[in-house]
Each structure stands twice: as structure tokens, then as C-alpha cells.
Amino acid sequence: MSSHDVVNVVRRVFNERRVGHAGTLDPQASGVLLVCVGPATRLDAYLVGHGKRYRMGVTFGLSTVTDDSEGEITKELSVPDRIAEEEFAQNYVEHMVGQGMQVPPIYSAIKVKGKKAYEQARAGKVIDLAPRPFEIYDACLSEVRDTLRLDGKTGIEWVCEMSVSKGTYMRSLARDMGRDLDCCAYVSSLARIRSGSIVLEDCVSLERLEQDKESALIDPLRALGIRFAFARECATKVEHGSSLLDEDLSLNEPLLTELYAPCTCTTSVIPSTKPPKPNELVGVIVDNRLKALYEYHESEHRYIPRCVFSIGVERGRTV
């Protein structure tokens, strides 16, 4: 199922055309997919840049046209004995941490001359994609195990977890791991287990969504992972999209609660003792709705509006 398929399900369940997702999942992958509904679709631009964490299975000895188990096999190479050694695998994965450049898979949604790369690849065209920067923040090996490869033979699979920057292609990482280890490799399983501050345990299946749509709702402040303030004396200024002074907002720490509570107006609110940072994005609450996002300009000692909602984004059930 593609990310677009998920969007279509959400549109039907909520009876709302304005639905978007923050960060495409490969059709083969499972896990966290943040979906914005109604006015919350304007938050997409602020959610897609968050780092993500994956649990990935990498199987060695074969390469495929899509760099995962969905594509046709393009090459088979013998697998060095060291790949089956857990100590070697652990050291290799841990040393992947850092910055680098990678060429995205040709079967990706990147646009080349106005058309998606995977559409051109399916049409038999030769795709030349430029390398892009990426960063692995941390990486660890969970397991080295025997597995059944796409060709029906027994192979070696590394199961690892990685936290990566926006725009990192896990299929490219697996492909390049194989090349670096003098064989070839593909992604045999992939699950996104965190997106920003939202973890897998916060999410619900599509089946659960169909039964109880409110069970999937998450406070937008938690999804954004930013500090926030209640507009008590400055609500009118926020409504009009005016700039705010330092003294207008008393910041609170980012929310750490899981799914939204029956009323989130005061749930887990911890006052912040740190002053606003230059260019920091903060949320402003009016009547228990996320009414606006403001950016702090240190030189002017004021907050500048970046996104103001006409009715605001709901944070909790009406009590």
C-alpha cells in the first residue's frame, strides 16, 4: 500500500478532502506515517523536515532494480564470509554514523525534468540522478540471521536500526552497503519506527482507524515537537496575525505525552525557563486550538507570524 492509498482511506473515514502526509513511505515499508487532516494540512511543511528512525533488514548477495524486494533481480554475487560474523557486522553498522552523499534509487518520487523518476524508469528510460547529502545520527545492529532470499536460496540478513536525516533513502544505504562489502544487497524489510517525536506506539492501524477514528488523533504540538504558549492577553493580536513582543508569550516545554487526552489544554504543561532562541518556531494556543506558528526574531525582540489558522487545529475533544 502506498502513502497515497493511506491518504485516500483517511479522506473517506474523516469525510474530508484536505488530507496530506508528512514524509512518503515506500510501498514495501510499514510504520509511522503522519497524516494531516483539514486545516492541519498547512503543518505539512513543518513536519516533513523531522529526522526519522527505521528498522531495516538488509539481505546480501543479490541486487534488484528497485533496491528492495519488490523489484526484479539484476545481479548475484558471492557473499564474503565476514558478512555472517556478528562482530564484523556490528562494527560496520556502527561506523556508518556520519554525513555522506548518496544517489537516490531510480524508482523514487524525485522529479527529473518535471516527471517522477519511477515513472520514467518504468517507461524504460535511463535515469541519471545526482548525489544528495544525508546524515546517519546513530546506527546499531539488532541481529545477523539466515534468511530466504528472493531467488529462493538461503542468505544472510542484517537487521539494524538507524536514525537518519530528512531525505535519506534507506534503499540507497542498503545498495551502497552491498557495494562497499564487495557483493550486492537489497532492503528485505523496512519499518519506520519514529518520525520526529512520534513513535510507532503512538500510531494505529488502518483497521483501527476504520473502527475508531478518534483513536488516531495526536496533538499537533507533540507532532511538531516545539515549545508553545497560551495566548491569554494577546489572543486578538494572534487572530489578526500581528507580531508579538517577548512579554506576550510565556513559553512551555515541548509536549511529551502520547496520544491526546480528553482535554489537552493543561495536560503535561511544563513552563520553560529558557529564553527564546533566534529563529525558534513556537506554537500559540487560543481556546485549546493551535492557532498559529510564530518565529522569534532576536534582533527585534519579537515573534513574527509564520502560519495563522482561521479556526485553528484541534488539540483535544470538547469537554
Feature map (PLM): residue ranges:
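Non-catalytic RNA-recognition surface used by pseudouridine synthases
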Residues: M1-S30, P39-E207, S299, I311-V319
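Accessory RNA 3′-end/elbow-binding domains used by RNA modification enzymes
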Residues: M1-H21, L25, A29, G155-E157, ...
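Phosphate-centric recognition/catalysis
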Residues: V35
